[in-house]
């Protein structure tokens, strides 16, 4: 049996540091990378993608509501098409950075309130 160890990374914000992310990328199989709406920024996404590539870690988008003040934990009432657009925008941001590194986003794992709504 193969087990996929997965971790949310790149969540640079006033709430979190990314100083341990490089160490975590030595032990995980897949990384959910914050896409800038609740946390993270493009330089951080690029750094995590580069280290993931080096370590053979698959890259996933970790989209959220545009809610940095609450770290994406506050529910925002959007209709289904607005939620799809929100997720796709963040996927596209991460995918563009991944492609610059000759990588692809392989999965999407929602964050915070968005993930709670998906459950």
Question: What would you call each of these model-derived segments?
Answer:
Residues 3-17:
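N-terminal basic/disordered segments at the start of proteins
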Residues 57-77, 109-114:
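Short, charge-patterned binding micro-sites
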Residues 3-7, 31-33, 59-63, 106-110:
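Hydrophobic faces of well-ordered beta-strands that scaffold small-molecule active sites
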Residues 13-46:
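A short alpha/beta connector and helix-capping loop motif
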Residues 22-26, 47-60, 99-101:
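Acidic (Asp/Glu)-rich catalytic clusters
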């Amino acid at each position: 049996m193969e087990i996929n160890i997965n971790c949310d990374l790149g969540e640079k914000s006033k709430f979190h540091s990314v100083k341990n992310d490089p160490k975590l990328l030595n032990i995980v199989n897949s990384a959910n990378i914050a896409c800038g709406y609740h946390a993270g920024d493009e330089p951080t996404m690029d750094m995590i993608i580069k280290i993931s590539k080096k370590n053979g870690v698959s890259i996933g988008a970790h989209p959220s509501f545009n809610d940095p003040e609450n770290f994406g934990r506050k529910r925002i009432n959007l209709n289904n098409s607005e939620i799809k657009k929100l997720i796709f925008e963040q996927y596209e941001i991460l995918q563009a950075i991944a492609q610059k590194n000759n990588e692809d986003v392989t999965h999407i794992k929602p964050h915070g309130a968005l993930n709670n709504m998906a459950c």
